[in-house]
Curated annotation (Swiss-Prot):
Its EC number is 2.6.1.1. It comes from Methylorubrum extorquens. This is Putative aspartate aminotransferase. It catalyses: L-aspartate + 2-oxoglutarate = oxaloacetate + L-glutamate. Homodimer. The keyword Disulfide bond does not apply.
Length: 93
């Protein structure tokens, strides 16, 4: 197997370190709500799951939103493109 020398220079995976810290805290009896990596360790409430199932079965719920987004954010993005790339964008289209 090839030894990739660049891999050895990478820092340790942060969530590996966090997992060790959490495990040690739990071993000491700490009550931890794990929100690491966006993966809660509690199940979703039953009523939330039921509403998701109900909504997923409705026609046209599998489309993107028609929302144009936040007007201030669109203006900021257009301004960034103008400053950075010299490109003029209309934030309303």
């Amino acid at each position: 197997m090839t030894d990739f020398h660049r891999i050895k220079r990478l820092p340790p995976y942060v969530f590996e370190q966090v997992n060790r810290i959490k495990a040690a805290a739990r071993a000491r009896g700490a009550d931890i709500i794990d929100l690491g990596m966006g993966n809660p360790d509690l199940d979703a409430p039953r009523h939330v799951i039921e509403k998701l199932v109900e909504t997923a079965g409705k026609p046209r719920t599998d489309r993107y939103s028609a929302s144009k987004g936040i007007a201030g954010l669109r203006r900021a993005q257009a301004g960034y493109y103008q400053r950075r790339f010299g490109v003029s964008l209309n934030p309303d289209t």
